[in-house]
């Protein structure tokens, strides 16, 4: 399978999801490339116990290697500062912080589940850790009866890979940011100066 190999990146728009973890849980960056209408996994970076400086460096490398249209990051708890720093470095229109509230987790899981059901994404074959993370997620009724997602934490993490994947799916939901510009004449042409080469 071609999913998960960054060397197969074809230059298309990319969408990134990041689950922040520092000590017990994993720090995971998930990169999807949009090819047609399918999100292909291009890279999954996992680190346990990575310093925030290393996490920043890994994210900067992703932004320099891939054409990142949008990045959704876990902003909950210790994620506040990494999100703020990433927005400062890469722009607040490209980096969005997502608080892991029950409604937001439900939205993320629903978007991810829909992508899987529609065969709209490709993940690396044989990634047992990811499959285990996906199976850790359970939809349960909250105290008010509203559905919410929970995941048991174990030595493999707290469904960190699944949340990073779902955050990347969420980043792709808005599609590329459209913009336009109007060129202005160069200063030297406004003054009537001619440039020679």
Predicted regions mapped to residue ranges:
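RNase H-like, metal-dependent nuclease domains and their acidic two-metal-ion catalytic environment used
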Residues: 1-102, 106, 110, 114, ...
């Amino acid at each position: 399978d071609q999913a998960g190999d960054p060397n197969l990146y074809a230059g298309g728009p990319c969408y990134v999801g990041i689950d922040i973890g520092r000590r017990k849980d994993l720090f995971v960056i998930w990169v999807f490339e949009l090819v047609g209408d399918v999100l292909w996994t291009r890279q999954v970076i996992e680190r346990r116990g990575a310093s925030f400086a290393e996490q920043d460096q890994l994210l900067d490398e992703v932004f320099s290697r891939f054409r990142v249209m949008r990045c959704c990051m876990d902003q909950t708890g210790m994620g506040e500062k990494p999100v703020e720093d990433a927005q400062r470095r890469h722009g607040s229109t490209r980096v969005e912080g997502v608080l892991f509230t029950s409604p937001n987790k439900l939205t993320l899981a629903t978007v991810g589940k829909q992508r899987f059901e529609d065969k709209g994404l490709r993940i690396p074959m044989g990634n047992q850790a990811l499959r285990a993370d996906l199976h850790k997620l359970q939809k349960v009724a909250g105290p008010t009866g509203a559905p919410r997602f929970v995941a048991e934490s174990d030595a493999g993490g707290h469904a960190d890979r699944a949340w990073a994947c779902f955050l990347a799916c969420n980043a792709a939901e808005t599609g590329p940011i459209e913009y336009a510009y109007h060129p202005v004449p160069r200063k030297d042409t406004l003054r009537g100066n001619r440039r020679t080469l």
